[in-house]
């Protein structure tokens, strides 16, 4: 109802549904901007051309930190085969993000989304409600998997490489 849409819960639900609709499998990955460890802007359009593994995480997320081991293994396996890994942190503090990157020894591009968890436009754009959350993007820029992890991620990457 229009009344429900105007209340705070209705507004939040609409935002979430809009994010899910804009980043559904089969659609072009939405354009976004994040910052690398040197403060340089990284955009989706600058990443196109390779298979992309977009890893949404945060330093305070225990399961995200555990997922890094699997991602490191897959990075080693696929880094020279046209697969690019990009971590997108939803930390509010750039210091905590940078410290976590050092602790995790992340060898791929690590970026920070403005706004932290609460106010990140990138999180809202992808309709992310929990992390870790991995989005797989094909060479053509279309989303081919959302919330794919570990063996499922590996299988989907192999499938894309064999096309």
PLM region spans:
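Thiol/disulfide oxidoreductase modules built on the thioredoxin-like
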Residues: 104-106, 113-162
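Hydrophobic, well-ordered secondary-structure elements that form the walls
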Residues: 54, 97, 110, 141
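Conserved hydrophobic packing residues within short motifs/helices of P-loop NTPase cores
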Residues: 54, 86-88, 111, 135
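N-proximal helix/coil linker or "cap" segments that precede and/or mark the start of modular domains
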Residues: 1-35, 40, 45-50, 76-79, ...
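Conserved redox-active cysteine motifs that mediate thiol-disulfide chemistry
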Residues: 48-49, 55-73
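Alpha/beta-hydrolase fold active-site loops
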Residues: 51-52, 132
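Structural microenvironment flanking redox-active thiols in thiol-disulfide oxidoreductases
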Residues: 66-104, 115-124
